[in-house]
């Protein structure tokens, strides 16, 4: 009778030990490039064939970031709309890949592993979690470059505008001087010679020379 009681007491204890899930996480993960890889190592010696692993954010695990479920034939994964997360199952570990993270998502994250089927339903006790610290991407180095390039463009544009105005003004002045010189030359060309008022017009054109008849008279007999 005593032997039967000992056997009955040992069987439940063995079941509890066999179906227990233990999870191990690294305590700190620093993210500098907005991409994080969180590995959840677990041990399970039960007979479950369908599992679910999920990643939770916050000390109270209130936010489920993403999850992955798998069995012998298929794998299913889903992510919260506020996160970019994907889960991968690999033997005795689940890998959660997160990308495009922001500094506001810095928090403590917990892995939860569940044996869904067949019964009994088992899940791990809450682990110590992993603090994911997301560093803000520095953008101050880009501002001076953009400002400098902007002012360089403004200076070049202003200089080109000044030179174009200067060239236009020189061209206008040169054109006005050329017109004045043409007017003066046309006035000189239109002037005709005139006889003094005391000379009489002998019927010859103004350009014809006058003949001297005294030379002819000296030859008369």
From Swiss-Prot:
Sugar-modified residues: 33, 41, 45, 71, 100, 128
Residue intervals on the Extracellular side: 14-149
Residues on Cytoplasmic side: 175-221
Pfam family, one: V-set
InterPro entries, A to Z: CD28, CTLA4/CD28, Ig-like_dom_sf, Ig-like_fold, Ig_V-set
Signal peptide: 1-13
GO CC list: external side of plasma membrane; plasma membrane
Subcellular location: Membrane
Membrane topology: Single-pass type I membrane protein
Disulphide bonds in the chain: 40-111, 66-85
UniProt keyword annotation of Disulfide bond present: yes
Annotated segments matching region Disordered: 188-209
GO biological process terms, semicolon-separated: immune response; positive regulation of T cell proliferation; T cell activation; T cell costimulation; T cell receptor signaling pathway
Chain ranges passing through the membrane: 150-174
Predominant location: membrane
Cited function: Possibly involved in T-cell activation.
Assembly, per entry: Monomer.
Name of the protein this chain belongs to: T-cell-specific surface glycoprotein CD28 homolog
């Amino acid at each position: 009778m005593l032997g039967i009681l000992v056997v009955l007491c040992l069987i439940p204890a063995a079941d509890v030990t066999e179906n227990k899930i233990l999870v191990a996480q690294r305590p700190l993960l620093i993210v500098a490039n907005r991409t994080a890889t969180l590995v959840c190592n677990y041990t399970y010696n039960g007979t479950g064939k369908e599992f679910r692993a999920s990643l939770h954010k916050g000390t109270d695990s209130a936010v489920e970031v993403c999850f992955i479920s798998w069995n012998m034939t298929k794998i299913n994964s889903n992510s919260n709309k506020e996160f970019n997360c994907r889960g991968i199952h690999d033997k005795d570990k689940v890998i959660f890949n997160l990308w495009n993270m922001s500094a506001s998502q810095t928090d403590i994250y917990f892995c939860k592993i569940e044996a869904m089927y067949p019964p009994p339903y088992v899940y791990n006790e809450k682990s110590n979690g992993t603090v994911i610290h997301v560093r803000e991407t520095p953008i101050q180095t880009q501002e001076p470059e953009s400002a400098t390039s902007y002012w360089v463009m403004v200076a070049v544009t202003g200089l080109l505008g000044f030179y174009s105005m200067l060239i236009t003004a020189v061209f206008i002045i040169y054109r006005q001087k050329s017109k004045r010189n043409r007017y003066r030359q046309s006035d000189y060309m239109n002037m005709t010679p005139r006889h003094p008022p005391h000379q009489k017009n002998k019927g010859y054109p103004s350009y014809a020379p006058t003949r001297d008849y005294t030379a002819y008279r000296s030859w008369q007999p």
